[in-house]
Design a protein with these regions (language model features):
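Conserved loop-alpha-helix segment in the C-terminal half of the alpha/beta-hydrolase fold
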Residues: 334-370
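Alpha/beta-hydrolase
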Residues: 57, 65-73, 245-344
């Protein structure tokens, strides 16, 4: 895997309060939507093996990490222009009592291996649901399944589900939300007993997890006018040399239809999924903050990834957000195995953080005893307080 998933950690955290503003009691009012999202992007065609079985999936991980495999820049076959609409499954939740933060919309983007349920766990939601935590502080929040995951559309895994497409999906979804036409332009799939109406948010804050955080970094750099702030979790600019970073060979993958034929029946060639709970523990968790029930839940909600995402990673990087002036906060597990080779202490790269966010005064926070999935670890609710406290301290 490339540096985009390992870079992280911007400036020491400046006096974030332990309690984020005033907590309110609120009923969860949500509407599930199928959003047609227009996308124009330039993807790449790559020379690479096909993945049509678990044998292929394992062989692909070996091939892509073999020292003599040509770099991605030498495997380019040309451009592929994407000009289409994709059906994205999303959930908009608003507080039942309209307070001063109700018109601040958070948009949460999950990472590889997850859909929007990463932010809205069904197990002990008061502890593990970031959606619930945000609503209790009076925010509105939009979560969505990235392309190729959950209930969203599952197109070609080689040529369409790539990083450029996913960046533009987030940008377009943000534009639709800011226009006040999110609900009216979508198909309503289910809703709470009380009707939720379209509204024009006064501010938009991007909340990312891992790969989702990287997408957000690119979106705020390309489209600075769309967002007013960002919290990037499980992403951390650091000083680990590229040669020491963990690559995809550390984790076993299977062809989705062979891993779970019923659950993954829609997934075709080019998709693969993490094999089992052991792989999920290695990637996402640390023993001290691991609740076995959450590990089982993670296995239940895990999502496939695509060959195209990994291939396009080799052509992707952080962009300098010259025109973005909103606050940025990096939030990382103290012992994130994936980003920091198991220990994120004392490796924060402030120079890199300030290079990519020169006008955002970026800060960082290490969530104690936590791995790569802080929202699904035992101390999740304490971490949510830190994140929401950061927003409150910046008038968001």
């Amino acid at each position: 895997m490339n540096t985009i998933f390992h870079l992280a950690s911007i400036g020491a955290l400046a006096l974030i309060p332990t309690v984020a503003g005033e907590t309110t009691t609120t009923t969860k009012l949500c509407v599930e939507l199928e959003v047609p999202v227009p996308v124009r992007a330039t993807n790449q065609l790559f020379d690479q093996p096909r993945v049509d079985s678990t044998i292929d999936a394992i062989d692909w991980t070996v091939w892509v990490s073999t020292r003599t495999t040509p770099p991605v820049t030498e495997r380019l076959l040309g451009n592929k222009t994407i000009d289409d609409k994709f059906l994205i499954n999303a959930q908009l939740c608003v507080p039942s009592d309209k307070g001063p933060k109700a018109d601040i919309l958070q948009i949460a983007t999950p990472g590889l291996g997850f859909d929007k349920r990463y932010f809205d766990a069904e197990i002990q939601p008061d502890e593990y649901s970031y959606v619930n935590a945000a609503l209790k502080k009076g925010y509105s929040i939009l979560t969505y399944d990235r392309l190729g995951t959950g209930k969203s559309q599952k197109p070609n895994a080689y040529d369409i589900v790539q990083i450029p497409t996913e960046i533009e999906i987030l940008a377009s979804l943000t534009k639709i939300a800011r226009s006040g036409k999110l609900i009216s332009s979508s198909k309503v799939l289910s809703k709470s007993s009380r009707t939720i109406s379209d509204f024009v948010p006064s501010k938009v804050v991007q909340i990312g997890y891992s790969f989702g955080s990287f997408l957000i970094q690119n979106v705020v750099a390309r489209y600075p006018e769309l967002s007013d702030g960002a919290i990037l979790t499980a992403l951390y600019p650091n000083t680990i040399p590229y040669s020491q970073m963990i690559d995809v060979l550390h984790y076993d993958h299977e062809f989705p239809k062979e891993n779970d034929p019923a659950r993954f029946s829609e997934y075709g060639s080019g998709y693969f999924v993490l094999s089992n709970e052991a792989d999920l523990q290695k990637l996402f968790f640390q023993k001290k903050s691991l609740d076995p029930a959450l590990l089982t839940y993670t296995e239940k909600i895990k999502q496939p990834e695509t060959v195209g995402e990994y291939a396009s990673e080799g052509l992707s990087s952080y962009l300098v957000a010259d025109n973005f002036k909103g606050p940025v906060h990096f939030f990382i597990g103290e012992f994130d195995n994936f980003v920091c080779r198991g220990d994120c202490r004392d490796i924060y790269n402030q120079t890199e953080a300030e290079r990519i966010f020169p006008h955002s005064n970026p800060t960082y926070y290490l969530q104690p005893e936590t791995g790569h999935a802080p929202a699904l670890s035992k101390n999740a609710s304490a971490g949510f307080e830190v994140m929401l406290g950061y927003l409150d301290s910046h008038n968001l």
